[in-house]
Amino acid sequence: MSDILNISCYKFTPLPDAAALRDTLAERAQALALKGTILLAEEGINFFLAGPAQAVHSFVDQLRADDRFADLAPKESWSDTVPFRKMLVKVKREIIRMDHPTIRPAEGRAPSVSPATLRRWLEQGHDDEGREVVTLDTRNDFEVDAGAFKDTIDWRITKFTEFPPALRAHKAELADKTVVSYCTGGIRCEKAAILMRDEGLEHVYQLEGGILKYFEETDGAFYDGGCFVFDERRAVGADLAITPLAPAEPLEPIQPTSPPGKA
């Protein structure tokens, strides 16, 4: 087995002390010799870390000691080397920028669907009520180009702030369908699903844990290609191992200072 544990995780929870928390988490990460990115905002936390398993687990255990983070459930994968160059801890306006202040996931989220349930729906061609199921990719266009669910809806957005106007332009196409929004790890599709509900779409779900959790808990069926990740691995396949990108696919910054799929 490879020696380096990579985790990604987020939690929408009020963090009025985000600035002070930044200093605390930076010190902890440095003491454990971890590398990656931690983003904090008043709406929550979003982080991507890599290092020896014991160090990574120690960091997560310390986070869970704070009641606000007690239920953190990081997604895990392994690599031979650390795919980040440094440790960044930043305070942002949003942990995933949508520029839509009425969307507050900490106050309530849209229903979610498990990876196993989505796989079953896609296999049978409809949900449990017989309604047509469509998947909606909420990532940026170049991420979609690296891999996506078969026949997914892709609005070719270049940043997440373009999602709300794209939804308004295409909302009628989603009526009477069961829509499952998805993204890399769940954070974008959580906001997207809430917005779709607010816009009057009734049968909307988010894919719990995103593509990475789908890979972790299923065989990756109905997904073509890899999942773009914002570190030196570039992309991972259904087995969560590194998979090559096509040469024509653009290279984004290795370690973003904004969340995956930069806003």
Swiss-Prot record:
Top EC class of this enzyme: oxidoreductase
GO biological process entries: tRNA modification
GO molecular function: oxidoreductase activity, acting on paired donors, with incorporation or reduction of molecular oxygen
EC number(s) given by UniProt: 1.14.-.-
Pfam families: Rhodanese, UPF0176_N
Keywords from the UniProt entry: Oxidoreductase, tRNA processing
KW Repeat (keyword) present: no
Family per record: Belongs to the TrhO family.
NCBIfam families named in the record: PRK05320.1
Protein name: tRNA uridine(34) hydroxylase
Organism: Delftia acidovorans (strain DSM 14801 / SPH-1)
Taxonomic path: Bacteria, Pseudomonadati, Pseudomonadota, Betaproteobacteria, Burkholderiales
